[in-house]
Design a protein with these regions (language model features):
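Conserved eukaryotic protein kinase-like
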Residues: 1-276
Length: 276
């Protein structure tokens, strides 16, 4: 059976330390929406992590190199996003100490069998206070992450919080809806999805930038909730962003509304067919 393998040079001290940190963390985590470590190997030249079978690649591959004849259906995209939210919810509240991923992006969302979302790449993770503590999660940290996903509050203060992951996930939600990268390098102004999409929501032009394949395929009630959630994740003030648990519940509700609308449409189709 094929496995997902991650390789890294062992000649760098920083790389070796990051590798060790990732192994220790992965050995403590068990959740269906986190990639499962099977084993690892270290020699003089290379460090290797061996993960479970990843049957359908990364989410990025399905947008950057997607098959134009078979793009991801809307419900599947929504289910993938719910899976990522569940994985993040577990990291933030389901382990002894809150864990902040810090690098939630399309490349780090892998798709296993049955298209189950698997959050991967824990190199940049930071451990916070006990997850059951009522203390506000704030960790002083050297700013790290990926351009296009970086939380402006984190950039400004160097204080890492669970809402940093929420911000990254908000970018992912709009990427999934629009089938566009977080930063459009082909644009003259190198537009950032985190700025551009909420601006389009505000001025009522969001329908003009969503994936053309999805036009007419998303139930209006589902669309509104999804867009509202994505926009709220990208609020400038991190205290105004929802917790990831709220995001998870909202996305699950959006899926329910989509399934209800799809069922109603099938019922109408059957009814109209029987009338002929």
């Amino acid at each position: 059976m094929a496995k997902y393998i991650k390789r890294k040079s062992s000649t760098s001290r920083q790389g070796f330390e990051e590798f060790g940190t990732e192994i220790l963390l992965l050995c403590q985590l068990r959740h269906p929406n986190l990639v499962n470590l099977i084993g690892y190997c270290i020699d003089e030249q290379e460090m290797i992590l061996i993960f479970e079978l990843i049957a359908n690649g990364s989410l990025m591959e399905h947008f950057l190199y997607r098959d134009q004849d078979d793009p991801l259906k809307w419900k599947r995209r929504l289910q993938i996003c719910i899976g990522v939210a569940r994985g993040l919810h577990y990291l933030h509240t389901g382990v002894k100490h809150t864990i902040i991923h810090r690098d939630v992006k399309l490349e780090n969302i892998l798709l296993g069998e049955s298209w189950k979302a698997k959050l991967a790449n824990f190199v940049l993770c930071k451990k916070g206070p006990p997850s059951l503590s009522k203390a506000l999660i704030r960790i002083d940290s050297v700013v790290k992450g990926t351009v296009g996903y970086l939380d402006p509050a984190y950039l400004r203060t160097s204080q890492l919080t669970d809402k940093t992951d929420v911000y990254c996930f908000g970018v992912v939600l709009f990427e999934v809806l629009c089938a566009r990268r977080s930063v459009d390098m082909e644009s003259e102004r190198e537009q950032s999805m985190a700025v551009w999409a909420p601006a389009c929501v505000e001025d009522g032009t969001i329908n003009q930038i969503i994936d053309p394949y999805l036009i007419g395929k998303i139930a209006p009630e589902c669309f509104k909730i999804y867009v509202d959630i994505a926009t709220s994740c990208l609020r400038e003030d991190n205290l105004e962003r929802p917790a990831i648990g709220e995001v998870e519940v909202g996305l699950e509700h959006a899926l329910e509304l989509q399934e209800y609308a799809d069922a109603a449409m099938r019922k109408d189709d059957v009814g109209s067919g029987s009338d002929q």
